[in-house]
Amino acid sequence: MLFGKKDIDLPANDLLYLLGDAPASRDWSWIRYGKGTDEWITGINLFNLPFEAGLNTNTYKYYIDFAARFGFDQIMLDAGWSDARDLFRIQPGMDMEELTRYAREKKIRLMLWTLSSTLERQLDSALNLFNRWGIETIMTDFMDRDDQEMVNFYHRVARACADHHIAIMFHGAYPPKGFNRTWPNVLTHESVLGSEWNIWSELPTPDHNVAIAYTRMLAGPLDYEPGLLLNAQRDQFRPIGKNPMSQSTRCHQLAMFVTYDSPLQIFSGNISQALLEPAFMELLGSIPTTWTDTKIIDGKTGEYIVTARQHGDDWYLAGLGGSTARDLEIPLDFLGAGDYEATICKDGRNAHNYAADYSLERLTVNGQVWLKIHLAPGGGFLVQFRKKQS
């Protein structure tokens, strides 16, 4: 059980991480973190293309080009790139040799989805194949248990991946609770009701999203996969299969990339839609996934949270709001001395009706400033602070 004097004492608590066994004494310097794209949540429902979108080489080259343009490190090849029961039976129309060559040329990494039972059966041979392709990260899915036999599977797979210098994300998984300390190549666990639930349910509400920061996040990195670009207020929302929307504003989706802790972040938005808004995507693409300092500035469980995270000399400030609109006044004293160029992305004047509405502005600030921000219902904001050279 974790304790804090205030709600905001809990989200940055790392006790469960520290309770994990220390990692084995081996070289972990090969591990790389970053941001990737996912195509499964939006059903590869792309547009403005000269080819038919789907599980084919041209589509994934399109994702690679997008990632390279907007500062992403990798793209996901989610379920379907191979037969779920045989990782060596590649989907017709997918030329993996060409895709891996093209990805290397563009300096983008490929991340592969696997079915956990298949990965276990083909573990060594599959990891050898992934090494030959230059794959550095995989996802394995549908464990859906936490008995001792399954816990042993997690350790067995993490160890084998480490031996092959491959990082891994566990989906359909129990929370890490220090597992990522024991195995640093285990970047994140899903273990959360995240973006994909917008496809078929009304469960990922703004209040739910805020509550995650005070509950699930305490157990370690989580893979929510935010970034849906079709946004709606609660009374406008409905699940729409391959064209999913969020029950929150565009800026609420953006703020999750800083609010939620995960050294591997996955953008789930439709990249054809994202290409129409380059300024927004350049800001999203700039967000780091690892941090040197974290401060929870303000918040109340299930209602809202304001988080500041530092990466090098720069800071990112994010606010995630529940279903009730609110006005915030946020001290910037965490910035310390000097001036910063602030890029502010916040709910637009009409976000209470049109949830995709947002505004972008830039100004110079310092640690003496208080920032005033209005959150629409289901709202959010993100501020990037870049240190100005004196």
Residue ranges: model-predicted function:
Residues D78-T249:
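Aromatic- and carboxylate-enriched substrate-binding clefts and catalytic-loop regions
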Residues I344-Q368:
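Solvent-exposed beta-strand/loop surfaces of large extracellular or lumenal domains
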Residues M1-K106, G379-G380:
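Conserved structural scaffold segments of CAZyme catalytic domains across common CAZy folds
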Residues A67, D141, I168, T259, ...:
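Conserved, mostly hydrophobic/aromatic
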Residues G269-Y316, H352-A356:
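Glycan-recognition and catalytic regions of carbohydrate-active enzymes
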Residues N243, H252-Q265, I271:
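Catalytic domains of carbohydrate-active enzymes that cleave complex glycans
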Residues K300-E341, F381-L382:
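Carbohydrate-binding surface patches
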Residues R362-S390:
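C-terminal beta-strand-rich structural cap/linker in extracellular carbohydrate-active enzymes
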